[in-house]
Amino acid sequence: MKNDTSRFSIRRAEPGDYQAFASTFAGERAYSGTLQMPFPSQDSWRKRLAEPDPNSVVLVVEAEGEVIANAGLHPAQPVDIRRRRHAMTLGITVRDDWQGKGAGTKLMSALVDLADNWFGALRLELTVYTDNAAAIALYRKFGFTVEGTHRAYALRDGRLVDTYAMARLHPHPPSRAPANDTEPKVAAT
């Protein structure tokens, strides 16, 4: 059955969302699927949200009056390399009790729209654990493909685990809008 994403609303993250971020990343499935550590600090999230990167966008999904998911769209690192200006990275996290209900799809749709139509990004990149089948399926749904495997990429629960490097190229890179063929009429003086 297809998930109904109309019950979700998306907005920019705000400094007051720090408790929801800490709560989301406290979920075992959430932190084990990211590079976050267990027992997240509310204070560290408060600081990060109070001083956001001006070149990034951090979004949240709300449902039933609560923040249940978050995602970020960031310039590819290192940001001072001009030859990588066309690329952006993204990350997404859904609270454990909301996974598989469409919040990730809603966020991915918003991130891809922002990247394609507002940032003019030609390439989106992400890293995902090779055993995170649900996330991989979500990314594939939005046109991401596996470009390679990072072996022993991160320590998770006492084991070194692999990740996939996934990317998506803009399917229809921006072009110039058609020119207006008529000259503007200027009043004679």
Regions found by a protein language model. Give the residues of each.
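Central antiparallel beta-sheet cores of small beta-barrel/beta-sandwich binding domains
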Residues: 67-71, 126, 131
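Terminal substrate-recognition subdomain of acyl/acetyltransferases
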Residues: 2-3, 159-189
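Acetyl-CoA-dependent GNAT
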Residues: 15-16, 34-99, 108-109, 114, ...
